[in-house]
Regions:
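Bacterial Sec-dependent N-terminal signal peptides
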Residues: 1-25
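Short active-site neighborhood of thiol/selenol oxidoreductases, capturing the structured segment around
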Residues: 313-342, 355-359
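Thiol/disulfide oxidoreductase modules built on the thioredoxin-like
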Residues: 386-426
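N-terminal targeting signals for export/organelle localization
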Residues: 225-298
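Structural micro-motif
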Residues: 67-69, 376-378, 395-403
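A non-transmembrane, solvent-exposed segment enriched in polar/low-complexity residues
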Residues: 19-190, 194-197
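Structural microenvironment flanking redox-active thiols in thiol-disulfide oxidoreductases
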Residues: 337-373, 386-392
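N-terminal "domain-start" segment that seeds a small globular fold
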Residues: 277-316, 423-428
Length: 428
């Protein structure tokens, strides 16, 4: 009797600690020790906690109700993968090779179901049209023709229905993705349809990863000449004093930034700055990252990781009359064409005490190392791609991105292209 009571007490105690558990198994030779679990708010990953490996397994205890997308990131190897939560235990096994994730095996029902549905949907959108086009070149009585016909028939079948009671998030995601983001031309939705969806959705809208693409679709539906009208109509319905209104406002500011729609970005960034109500963490983050890189602001300092061509420990340690800070990547085609132009004028710039600091968004060490052998300026990289800390700190959405700083590290110019950099210093 005592044993039964003790076991019941342990179970009760554990259930108080966690609403659900995320368990991730890795092979013995996987070298990472730390894993970070993220939830989602709109398009922003939110850190929940960091755990250390124990018996080749990471175990996260999530204390609250959560339905939506989640992500685990391994900072040492820059591996990451996504999965879902339906407020039930999540069980995942990783297959790795050379310390990189080769495959993710979902062992819980919800993630296995979601994975199969997404795989089927992708094949239907991308592969089915191609198979249908090549079918006419093969006879049905040939071995390949028969296989082709079978695969077309399989992909053409409607997906098995999803029970919204058993799988509320899977139902929400797939139903609304199909309605608002499908490539099917017959499924046209109006701006009013999208406004109603955003306004009336439950909290799964913010955790689903659908919000950003749905907003882009909303803007596209309104057309380029009606952007302000469309946005004002949406925000008037949502009310920017509400958490959802502020999340949408934050997303729109980021969208305008990514697509270089500066006039609209400035208009709605100004609206956000002038709000007198309580600001959510989501909008506050957007305001901060934009404030960091405004003209006249002091460029936030950065601690170098493995800097090349300098003994300086931080960005501010580099003394110069001006600094050109570049965010770039060895795989960026625009960087490939623009950085050599800067290289051609490097000696002229250096003679005027103008230093260049290039921070890379690479992930592949070999690619980065080979590329920087040609660049005599200060180079550094975290080798974490868009997971690099400076992507958020400096509000970087594309490469290359340029900043020009004065001797006191104040931002005095934000050139669009390398030609603008050279024109600013009159070295073209």
């Amino acid at each position: 009797m005592k044993k039964i009571f003790l076991l019941s007490a342990i179970i009760a105690s554990f259930s108080l600690q966690a609403q659900f558990i995320v368990s991730i198994q890795a092979p013995v030779d996987f070298k990472d020790h730390d894993a970070i679990l993220y939830t989602l708010n709109g398009s922003k990953d939110i850190i929940f906690s960091k755990e250390k490996i124990k018996n080749n397994t990471w175990t996260f205890q999530y204390p609250k109700n959560y339905m939506g997308m989640m992500k685990v990131y391994f900072p040492d190897s820059n591996n990451t993968f996504n999965f879902i939560s339906e407020n039930k235990n999540v069980n995942i096994k990783l297959e790795t090779q050379a310390n990189k994730i080769k495959d993710v095996i979902y062992l819980d029902e919800a993630n296995e179901r979601m994975s199969n549905l997404q795989e089927g949907s992708q094949k239907k959108e991308l592969i089915l049209p191609a198979l249908s086009q090549i079918k006419e070149y093969y006879k049905d009585n040939t071995e390949f023709g028969k296989a082709l016909k079978t695969e077309i028939s399989r992909l053409s079948r409607s997906s098995e229905g999803i029970n919204p009671t058993q799988h509320p998030f899977i139902y929400y995601y797939n139903t609304n993705y199909s309605k608002f983001l499908s490539n099917d031309a017959s499924k046209k939705v109006s701006q009013d349809d999208i406004i109603n969806f955003i306004d009336k959705s439950n909290d799964m809208l913010e955790t689903s990863s659908l919000l950003r693409p749905v907003l882009v679709s909303y803007l596209n539906t309104g057309g380029n000449t009606n952007v302000s009208t469309s946005v004002d109509k949406l925000l008037d319905r949502l009310k920017v004093e509400t958490p959802r209104g502020q999340t949408v406002l934050s997303e729109l500011i980021d969208i305008f930034d990514v697509y270089d729609m500066q006039d609209f970005k400035n208009k709605y960034l100004g609206m956000a700055k002038n709000l007198k109500c309580t600001i959510t963490d989501r909008l506050a983050s957007t305001l901060k990252s934009n404030a960091n890189v405004e003209i006249g602001a002091v460029f936030p300092n950065y601690n170098f990781h493995i800097p090349i061509n300098t003994n300086a420990k931080t960005l501010h340690d580099i003394k110069a009359d001006n600094k050109i800070v570049i965010f770039w990547s060895s795989t960026c085609s625009h960087c490939e064409s623009e950085l050599p132009q800067l290289l051609a004028k490097y000696n002229d710039l250096k003679a005027r005490n103008i230093q260049i600091v290039a921070l890379s968004l690479d992930t592949d060490k070999d690619s980065y190392t080979k590329k920087i052998t040609a660049f005599p300026w200060v180079n550094d990289s975290e080798l974490k791609g868009w997971n690099s800390s400076y992507a958020d700190t400096y509000n970087v959405h594309a490469t290359p991105t340029y900043f020009i700083l004065d001797a006191n590290n104040k931002i005095i110019n934000k050139p669009e292209h390398v030609g603008d950099v050279l024109e600013y210093f009159k070295v073209k």
